[in-house]
Amino acid sequence: MVGAAPACPGDAGTMRCAAAALVAIASIASIGAAFAAPPLGSHQHGVVQLDIAVDANRISVQMSSPLDNLLGFERAPRNEAERGRVAAMLATLRDTLFVVDPAGACRAGAVQLSSAALKLGEPDPAEQQSGHADLDASFEFDCSSAARAGFIDTSLFERFAGIQRIDVQLATSRGQRKLTLTRPAQRIVLPR
């Protein structure tokens, strides 16, 4: 009979059957992984990854993007015009890219930026060896009641023409979920 489980007589047979079952499960899992979506933080032009965590008194936004999305190139700047573009990008990232629903009573906190190509923060050895250049950013919001916040608005599409899609992973006390924003959307709705 096709698809029927093999008979496992006796103790020795049970161990062999258990081992065979584990091999089968591992094979199925590896096939599924091969067709899964790219891991968060993977380098894909036009796409920004956001991880958002909502705690009782804090909202954290972790962003990862290829530099090309933000600058139009993926390397250290080579001339004065490119250095000017980098300075403008950094100022924009330190500005108000994310606005939290006033119901959460949040105020913007620290912004941390990291990019090996731009010599910002801690260099990522994997990025240096890959030939691709990314920018990772961390945005913190201190809140009186983060759980009351119903949304976060972002101006990423408005400020950076190279961004075509934003993949978001949310983690709150009400659970986790994924969503995707495309132009002209700017609101990330938080689970309530």
Where are these regions (language model features)?
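Intrinsic, low-complexity polybasic segments
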Residues: G3-P6
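N-terminal soluble domains immediately following signal/targeting peptides that reside
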Residues: A37-R192
